[in-house]
Amino acid sequence: SCYYDLRFVCFNNINWIGNGLTLPSGPLRENINNLKNYNHIFLNGNLENLDAITRKLEKINPNLTIHIGEYIPSNINEFSKNDNFIVFSGIGNHQTFVRMIKNYQLNVVREFEYPDHYNYSTNEIDKICNEAKNLNCKIITTEKDYLRISKNNINLDQIKYIKSNLKIKDEEKLINSIIKL
């Protein structure tokens, strides 16, 4: 058994604990009651559901230090609020990505959600591009998906990506908790 000075766990604040079950039946890697063994928790996403999640966490482990992270797009100014968009991604939290885009008042007309680490075929990308043409939309994906597609020699002329960074709220609290060691 290993001893850790600090134990962190991370959740997306939209998906949170999903159906509450562990793998393979649910998204959790261990039972939610094991949060009693952790010092710190990261809730990342778009600042939704934080109060309800925080109350539940405090019931399980009142000693948890909760850190909040928000995804911030760094190139959002490259996209016009006057345009319509089709969004696609193959990431673990597609809805977090879509909500981030919508929070910046971009009009998402259609979205395509694929499994995490998805390997897109040329036909699938062509389908998205044709749909965008038919709906007079521009196409947005994640930087991660864009890079994955670019390795497959797929034409990327119509596809743009959002660069996003995780901004830790109250970063000083996190740094101080690490320095205390």
Regions found by a protein language model. Name each.
Residues S1-N61:
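Phosphate/Mg2+-binding loops and adjacent switch elements
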Residues C2-Y3, I32-N37, I60-N61, F79-S80, ...:
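Short, conserved loop/helix-junction motifs that constitute active-site signature segments
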Residues Y38, G90, I139:
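Residue-level signal for inorganic ion chemistry
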Residues L47-R55, Q95-T96, Y146-K151, D170:
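Short, charged/polar "capping" segments at the starts of alpha-helices
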Residues F79-T122:
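Redox- and metal-dependent alpha/beta enzyme cores, enriched for Fe-S-associated oxidoreductases
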